[in-house]
């Protein structure tokens, strides 16, 4: 079981990174909420991982904090929620926002996420309520601490910001028309791709 990786961040293309650890390159998929807390390329990064073995692939999912990984692990235990959908959920909202949705029985917000229908949202609310109580008790005071001490700075503005944003939304399961409309609605001159993706996601919730 690979539970933690520490190495050089050599590639970043949302939602995937390539982390070089002692000469080996690990492909890691991350929720966007974690992805944008990473340092710049060619800097050291630490990610907590969840390893999935399937018949046709071996996949690594990465997170900035243990608490976020713990939430991911709870999500994939929910009936009808696999790693891909769990990653989409944590890309569309932070861990604390998801917890708030469960506490408020907020189905309306959950069903706006791609792949989350009404039945899945209802299952999440029912099955996650008790699980989250245990998680919050175990991590009281520590959830999303990294947000307060993050050294993240936006990447330089590039001409393909809109293309990158649309590609990231498509990778999360949004339809081309949805992605294009959301990006166009929030785009402003000077926006970098990371800010544009965040704004686009917020506009759809």
Swiss-Prot record:
Main localization is cytoplasm
- Give me the ranges of the annotated region Domain II: 65-143
Q: Where is this region: Domain III?
A: 157-205
Whether Secreted counts among this entry's keywords is: no
Q: Per its UniProt entry, which superkingdom is the organism in?
A: Bacteria
Quote the InterPro entries the UniProt record gives: DNA_helicase_Holl-junc_RuvA_I, Hlx-hairpin-Hlx_DNA-bd_motif, NA-bd_OB-fold, RuvA, RuvA_2-like, RuvA_C, RuvA_C_sf
Molecular functions (GO terms):
ATP binding; four-way junction DNA binding; four-way junction helicase activity
Check the record and name the Pfam families matching this protein: HHH_5 (PF14520), RuvA_C (PF07499), RuvA_N (PF01330)
Q: What does this protein do?
A: The RuvA-RuvB-RuvC complex processes Holliday junction (HJ) DNA during genetic recombination and DNA repair, while the RuvA-RuvB complex plays an important role in the rescue of blocked DNA replication forks via replication fork reversal (RFR). RuvA specifically binds to HJ cruciform DNA, conferring on it an open structure. The RuvB hexamer acts as an ATP-dependent pump, pulling dsDNA into and through the RuvAB complex. HJ branch migration allows RuvC to scan DNA until it finds its consensus sequence, where it cleaves and resolves the cruciform DNA.
Similarity comment:
Belongs to the RuvA family.
Can you state the subunit structure given in the record?
Homotetramer. Forms an RuvA(8)-RuvB(12)-Holliday junction (HJ) complex. HJ DNA is sandwiched between 2 RuvA tetramers; dsDNA enters through RuvA and exits via RuvB. An RuvB hexamer assembles on each DNA strand where it exits the tetramer. Each RuvB hexamer is contacted by two RuvA subunits (via domain III) on 2 adjacent RuvB subunits; this complex drives branch migration. In the full resolvosome a probable DNA-RuvA(4)-RuvB(12)-RuvC(2) complex forms which resolves the HJ.
Protein name as catalogued: Holliday junction branch migration complex subunit RuvA
Which source organism? Shewanella sediminis (strain HAW-EB3)
